[in-house]
Amino acid sequence: MKVVLGVINVSDRASEGLYEDTPGKACVALLREWLTTPFEAAYAVVPDVQAKIEAELKRMADEAGCCLIVTTGGTGPAPRDVTPEATAAVCGQMLPGFGEAMRAASLKIVPTAILSRQTAGIRGHTLIVNLPGRPKSIKENLAAVFPAIPYCIDLIGGPRLETNGATMPVFRPKAEPS
């Protein structure tokens, strides 16, 4: 089974070419560092427009066949930060524990983490996770929840993702003997 992971950088300025897309590239680099499972990266940069974010999430989940989509940016309280709303609009189930865990981890580093509205949800066989827009924050937040991501993808019928245990251990419950 071909594994496709999606990364969407939500940024007005990056989508207009006004600055280099470092958040999205940082996210792909982290996934390549942590995963030993070969994967193809689906990639997009979209403006902070809810309809465009929703359309790209649907395209990656439904057409590109991504088992995991991570978004970067658009998770704060500013009026144009609508990534969580777009995620909720396209998901059948929400996983609020992801946002709670990321905020808890970030609060140990910076008090403004409480302003983050990032979340996660499931669309079909795809897990969608919102991340902040700064590369340092992306790593800190993704590290807080990544140990649960491969098992979540197992549970929703996606491919088995294996990681480099030295750089990113994951948790999968052991099967109980029959």
Regions found by a protein language model. Give the residues of each.
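Non-catalytic beta/alpha edge segments that cap or flank active sites
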Residues: M1-S178
